[in-house]
Amino acid sequence: MSSYPPHVIVLIGATASGKTELAIEIAEYFKTRIHNIDSRQIYKSMDIGTAKPSENQQKKIKHFLIDIEEPINPINVKQFQEIAQKSIQKEIKQNNLPLLVGGSGLYMNAITKGFFVPDVPPQNNLREQLEELGQKECWELLKNCDPISAKKINLADQIRTIRALEVFYVTGKPLSSQKVQKPPQWKILELGLNRDNLKERISRRTKNMFLSGIIEETKNLISRYGSDLPILETIGYREAKDVLNNNLPIDKAIELTNIKTNQFAKRQKTWFRNKNNPIWLNNKNLLKDAIIKIESFLD
């Protein structure tokens, strides 16, 4: 492939929608490789809980941006943006067609739309103080110092509220004034995967996750990095950790993980609807529809 501006294919969809399987079929057809845009699959030793592409799948098609760092060394959005864009540019220079696949809207848009995110590391002491104040008080503080960000952040969203306050207190500038958009010079086709039976797919994946060994994987992560590893607070690992601590029976852990995953999928779909404008694929024949749309885009 040789064209200017370079062509890039993006496949987005909620968790458990089948992105990995479809992406591999697309990559096989177009003889290309996959860039994995996922906020957890970038970490080593976290395979089951993140539904990472299997060893066989990775042998079949080369996947970039998987297993690039130890879980003890968190990668923020800005760092991931830089790593991913370099990897994608390398593919472009080799006249390959980059295929970006993921469900993390923030990470994907940072790459494809070029959002600049302030490079402010977590301020643990500040976060503890803000958490003690409570979410309602924190949101009121944010409304006073950064009203633009406050309008965009849900009153109940503690993580984003504290992050916006953190950036303000460290830099002295509102987060909203520091978000700059410098999109890469790519021509992008954004395809969307929206399954009708997503709840059933999530239920099957959740059960399979526990049958496949997420509890043992969590135990190994705790053994290597300690129980305070932040990423162990994410969906699936939090519940597995509670099982290990005898705070939760396995059946309740599966039930809770399923509920949280459905809630997460709902937020993903809302994000894609509000912040992206994908061409939604026909669920009756996903691969055929994707091929038709990509070939038309490349002509």
UniProtKB/Swiss-Prot annotation:
Substrate binds at T15, A16, S17, G18, K19, T20. It is an enzyme of class 2 (transferase). The keyword tRNA processing applies. The keyword Transmembrane helix does not apply. It catalyses: adenosine(37) in tRNA + dimethylallyl diphosphate = N(6)-dimethylallyladenosine(37) in tRNA + diphosphate. Monomer. Belongs to the IPP transferase family. Catalyzes the transfer of a dimethylallyl group onto the adenine at position 37 in tRNAs that read codons beginning with uridine, leading to the formation of N6-(dimethylallyl)adenosine (i(6)A). This is tRNA dimethylallyltransferase. It comes from Prochlorococcus marinus (strain MIT 9312). The gene is miaA.
